[in-house]
Every structure is written in structure tokens, then in C-alpha cells.
Amino acid sequence: MKSYPLLSTIDQPADLRGLSRAELKQLAQELRDHVLTSVSQTGGHLSSNLGTVELTIALHHVFNTPQDRLVWDVGHQTYPHKILTGRRDRMAGLRQLGGISGFPRRDESEYDTFGTAHSSTSISAALGMALAAKIKGEDRRSVAIIGDGAMTAGMAFEALNNAGVSGANMLVVLNDNDMSISPPVGALNRYFARLMSGRFYSAARQGAKSVLKNAPPLLELARRFEEHAKGMIVPSTIFEEFGFTYVGPIDGHDLDSLIPTLENLRDRKGPQFLHVVTKKGYGYKLAEADPVAYHGPGKFNPAEGLKKAAPGKPSFTQVFGQWLCDMAAKDTRLVGITPAMREGSGMVEFEQRFPDRYFDVGIAEQHAVTFAAGLACEGLKPVVAIYSTFLQRGYDQLIHDVAIQNLPVVFALDRAGIVGADGATHAGAYDIAYVRCVPHLSLIAPADENECRQALTAAFEQQHPVAVRYPRGAGVGVAVQSELTALPWGRGELRREARGGGRRIAILAFGTLLYPALAAAEKLDATVANMRFIKPLDTELVLSLARSHEALVTVEEGCLQGGAGSAVLEALQAAGVNLPVLTLGLPDEFVEHGDPAKLLAQLGLDAAGIEQSILKRFGAKLELVRPAING
């Protein structure tokens, strides 16, 4: 058990405000080690958290949290924040079922002022809090901490545009971990940051404006001179054009620079902008050398680092990546698009082999969808690789720019269904409902790896938009054919027929829950259909099973409201067929973080749960296997 002499005394941020600068530096070392040790034992986000240790300490040291509001963007870099705000001893349960979240949550701590996990929301939220304080007459500051990646999203600039003219007492901290500062430039920037953030500079600046306000040409000349002087040392003054006072860049790992600069900015009125430079993986050489590999590792030995995983069943993401390369080699019209998820979406090899047809548009899902529409208008065949949860951010574009124009865009929806440790914010629970209600837009839910490849091929062959949803992780181990063959369009298949005359129950499985449905059916002697297509639904198969069975059961890894089960009920109603239907899927609640298999079992969507739900609804096992009354 490691000993942390200083960290063990920090139960809340107030405990670190009396520490000396030397003690704060020691605290940073202990905090970084605790983050590394914790993540190595549970898995989680590592590189980003190692890079925010000093910044987190400085923010809690300078600002009176939780009275002052810290709003973290994305939130996967908040482990140091969690440790310093009373959750040090709960890190062993990080992202585990029943443990603390890997992201800020308002219901977890008063220091988590705003729940998040998607990017680019912090400035908007912090502005709302700052103006609320003004309306209520409360004396407090709001601070948004946002990364350079999240600054590529339009929402961040919408918020900057609004905040700059609001006069709100707020600070935006840009955590820039995609550049570095050489020591000489860093020293100069430290001096300049202190100068720009200090009271003398601010007072002199305002005084000069007052003197020159009656001489506009001189005022404009002075403004341009100031910008020219700053431009020799700092980046673009775009943020000042938004109405912010810009300070930086400064070294985000240097407490001697961070603390006095933040103290100066804390006492200034109006919108302030601080640019800090950090390094992902800082303090752990292996993560510094390969921050992508250590972005979200599983359990590992810090002394040895990550080990290459033994060959196993391919993941659905890998199946997609291979299909993308194979189809691109066959059809030169294919172009691949990702909103900043190259590794996560399995597009690394595609970028290497087809660089001119690969587009990473940054964290800009709205743009990604409409960009794909523009490509499709010119005869290309765009494939947008995007997590199910992130397509939600481009929903208007999906309808307005793609579906209404009936453009042939393929959406590869990764992370559909339960995602596990990332929890409710990343769950792909809603895509079935929000996709199937849109005209022109089709949706396929393959059951395994080979069907995923075939579904993507079928989608690519269409002349209208199609989404293919598949889960995170590996499939069941089905062999993947090398040929680019397509699923029969709009057709499901029977995978098991009841034996011994038992024709009472038919299970209609959508997606990867086919396999637990088959296992449950063996216990109940039920018929099982692999539906494959949610839209267009194979109504012929649905009605055939309805006429030959006494009850239907639908199974899906998506929300029940508006889901695949609802589609089956609508089809039966339209045909005037009336029989009992049990719909199984995700409940009307946000599913918490935890191991996916345990979560599915908890939700009754594993084989045992499906069996028990059917028995509970339709009776004892002996009754289920008796011949159907009207069979």
C-alpha cells in the first residue's frame, strides 16, 4: 500500500489552500502517482488526467470552490479533481458498477457543478452560472476548463461569442495539450502572462483608453500596437475579438506560473481567457511517448506498461475498419469521415492506405453529417463512422441535410447499446428510436461480426441513407467472410424453430441479443427469428410468426420507447393482427456505468433474464411447450 503523506491529509480543497508552494509541488507528485496507480488497477482515462494535475491543484488553491464554480469540459480529465474533492478513497471503484463515475456528476459531489462527458459544453454552462450569479446578486466566479480538441466544436465558439459581450465575471481556461513551449519562450511567456493579468497592466490599459477615447485614430493606433506587441509572443488575438482579455500561453505544469496568474485573473471583472499548455501523460514516460495508447487503457502494470493483447475475437470496430478498407479498394467513390474518433472508430488503417479519401473533421458532428451530404451530392459515397451517442449532436443535419434530400450516406454507428464503464452519457440507447422515425433512412442491426460486414455492404449498395448499428467490443467469434456480400435487403431469417409441437412463443431478436435469445429459446423450446432489419422491418416474417404462434417476444439493446418492439407492434396493428407481445429492451431510465455483461444481466437482457421474463409473462415452462391451441 503506497503512502501519500500530503495527499492523505486532503479531504477537501480548503485543506490545500494553506499549503506552501513547495508543499503544493509535493502534492502534485503524490496526486499524479495516485492517479496512475488507480487507473492501472481499474482501467480508465489516463493521459488526459496526468496532464491536468498541476492545473487542478492551482484552480482549487486559487478559487473558493465549491462557491466558485469549476466547469470541466468533457470531464474525462477530472480524476485529480475527484481525488481532491473527497473521493480519494473511492478511486478503487472508479467506473465500476456501484462505484464513482469517470465523469463529473452533480449527484456525486457538490464540487461537480455540471455533469458532462460530451465535449464543448463548458463555456455555455459556465456563462449560465456566471449570469445567474449576477441576477441573484451573488459574488462568485465561474471557470470553464476546455481542451484544444473541444475548441474545434461550433458550440464552443457560439458560447464565446455570447460570453464576450455579456460582461459576465467568468474565466475560460484553454488546456492546450497539443503543442509545447521551449524553455526560453516559456520563461518569457510566464513574465508576459503575469504582466498582462496584473492590476497595473489592466488599470493602465483602461486609463489609456479613457484618455484616447476622444481621439479615435490614436486609440486605434494604440490598440494595433498592443496587438502587435502581444503577437510577437502569444498566439492569435482571436479570443480578444470575442470580447475576452487573453492571457498566455503559460506552462500548465508550472505552479509558480499558474497560481499568480490565476490569482490576478480571479480579481478581474468581465470575461477572461487563460491559455495554458500541458502535455498528455505528463510525469509517466510511457504515456508521454504514446498518449493515444494510454488515453483509455484497461488494467496494466505501471512498471511494465501496456502489453500487446493476445489475438482474440475481432471487435465490431475492427470488422468495420477492415470492411472500410476492402470496400474502398473496390470502389473509388468511397470516402471515410470521422469526427475526431480515428482510433476509436477503427479508421487508422484506412487513413494510412487512403489518405486522400480520409477526413477527420474534428469534434464537429453537425459539420460531419452535412459535409457527408455535400460529398454525396457530387456522386461520392460517404461513410460516416460515428458513435451512436454522438450522432445525437448532428440530428438536425441527419434529417434536414441527408434524409430530406435522400442522399446515399452510410452511418456506421459504433457503441450502440450498453457501453459499460463510460455510463449513461455514452450509451447508444436511443439510435433505434431516433433513426427509424425519419423518412428515407434505413437501419440495420447485425447479430454478429460476419453479419456486420454484410450489413455494411448492403448499406453501401443503397441509393438512400442507411445506418448500421453495432456494439462496442468483440462479437461471438463467428468467422468473417472475405467476400463483400450483402445481406438480402429487408429480410430477416429463422434461426430456430420450436420442436415437439411447441409453437406457442416466437422470439424476434434484433442485433447481438440474438445469441442470448437463442440460449433462452433452448430452455423454452421457442422459435427464434434474427430480424436484422429494423427499418425496413421484415413484416412478412413478423406476420408469419404471428399467425403460427400464440405470442411474440421482441428483444433489443435499445430503448423500448419507439424502438424495434414498437415497430413490430405497429406492423401488427396495421395488419389487424391481435396477439400478446412482450417487448424487452432498455428501460426508461439512464443506465449507469459498469461491466456490460453485468449490466445486461441486471436489466434482464442476458439468456437467464430473457427466459425469466417470458416465464413471468406467459406462464410456467410446461405450459409454454404445449402445442398451440390454434396451431
From Swiss-Prot:
Source superkingdom: Bacteria
Cofactor note: Binds 1 Mg(2+) ion per subunit.
Gene3D superfamilies per the UniProt record, alphabetical: 3.40.50.920, 3.40.50.970
Database matches in PANTHER family: 1-D-DEOXYXYLULOSE 5-PHOSPHATE SYNTHASE-RELATED, 1-DEOXY-D-XYLULOSE-5-PHOSPHATE SYNTHASE, CHLOROPLASTIC
SMART domains associated with the record: Transket_pyr
Function: Catalyzes the acyloin condensation reaction between C atoms 2 and 3 of pyruvate and glyceraldehyde 3-phosphate to yield 1-deoxy-D-xylulose-5-phosphate (DXP).
Alphabetical list of InterPro entries matching this protein: Dxylulose-5-P_synthase, THDP-binding, Transketo_C/PFOR_II, Transketolase-like_Pyr-bd, Transketolase_BS, Transketolase_C, Transketolase_CS
GO cellular component: cytosol
Designated name of the protein: 1-deoxy-D-xylulose-5-phosphate synthase
Molecular function as annotated in GO: 1-deoxy-D-xylulose-5-phosphate synthase activity; magnesium ion binding; thiamine pyrophosphate binding
Alphabetized NCBIfam families for the sequence: dxs, PRK05444.2-2
Keywords: Isoprene biosynthesis, Magnesium, Metal-binding, Thiamine biosynthesis, Thiamine pyrophosphate, Transferase
GO biological process: 1-deoxy-D-xylulose 5-phosphate biosynthetic process; isopentenyl diphosphate biosynthetic process, methylerythritol 4-phosphate pathway; terpenoid biosynthetic process; thiamine biosynthetic process
Subunit structure: Homodimer.
EC code: 2.2.1.7
